[in-house]
Amino acid sequence: MAQTQSPFQWLATKLIRGYQIFISPILGPKCRFQPTCSHYAIEAIQLHGVIKGSWFAAKRILKCHPLHPGGNDPVPPKKDRCNK
């Protein structure tokens, strides 16, 4: 069952895709994580919505620097409201 996107999720995803297509190739591969920070941001926004997903993406981007080892860092699963 496909989940529908809000207009804000659609816009945020398109902006990140624009970065991936036009800016990232110029900068070259620098992300220390798997999935890359931009793919992580898209997945987080799709799963958690624009506000919470952007928060996860911002925290991830702040960790992406030469002093952090990087590695596999998937998007946290969405918590069920009944099981908090």
UniProtKB/Swiss-Prot annotation:
This is Putative membrane protein insertion efficiency factor. The keyword Iron does not apply. It is found in: Cell inner membrane. Keywords: Cell inner membrane, Cell membrane, Membrane. InterPro entries: Membr_insert_effic_factor_YidD. Pfam families: YidD. Its main location: membrane. It comes from the Bacteria. It is a peripheral membrane protein. GO terms for cellular component: plasma membrane. Coiled coil: none annotated. SMART domains: Haemolytic. Could be involved in insertion of integral membrane proteins into the membrane. Belongs to the UPF0161 family. The keyword Membrane applies.
